[in-house]
């Protein structure tokens, strides 16, 4: 299924990093904080001065957006204004 965000919104896929304690214990999903890194999967109508595009990795406000499932994968539809930074590698 293809989802195209409307307005100044993005469809992002959270980047889940496996969390371990200092002792090497892997934490279950319920004990982890919500991720704040994601990859942009689809873009809506972005402002002209916006420097984001599909494939960019970003840091976003962890309590923003609407979580959705597409083909058993987790995604978030988020406003462009809730993107805090672009990760440049």
From Swiss-Prot:
It is found in: Cytoplasm. Its main location: cytoplasm. Keywords: Chaperone, Cytoplasm. InterPro entries: Chaperonin_GroES (IPR020818), Chaperonin_GroES_sf (IPR037124), Chaprnonin_Cpn10_CS (IPR018369), GroES-like_sf (IPR011032). One of its GO terms (biological process) is chaperone cofactor-dependent protein refolding. Belongs to the GroES chaperonin family. Heptamer of 7 subunits arranged in a ring. Interacts with the chaperonin GroEL. This is Co-chaperonin GroES. It comes from Fervidobacterium nodosum (strain ATCC 35602 / DSM 5306 / Rt17-B1). The gene is groES.
């Amino acid at each position: 299924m293809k989802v195209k965000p409307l307005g100044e919104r993005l469809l992002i896929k959270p980047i889940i990093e496996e969390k371990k304690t200092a002792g090497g214990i892997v934490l279950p999903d319920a004990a982890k904080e919500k991720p704040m890194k994601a990859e942009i999967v689809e873009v809506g109508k972005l402002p002209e001065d916006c420097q984001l595009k599909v494939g960019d990795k970003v840091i976003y406000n962890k309590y923003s957006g609407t979580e959705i499932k597409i083909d058993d994968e987790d995604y978030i539809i988020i406003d462009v204004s809730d993107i805090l930074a672009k990760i440049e590698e």
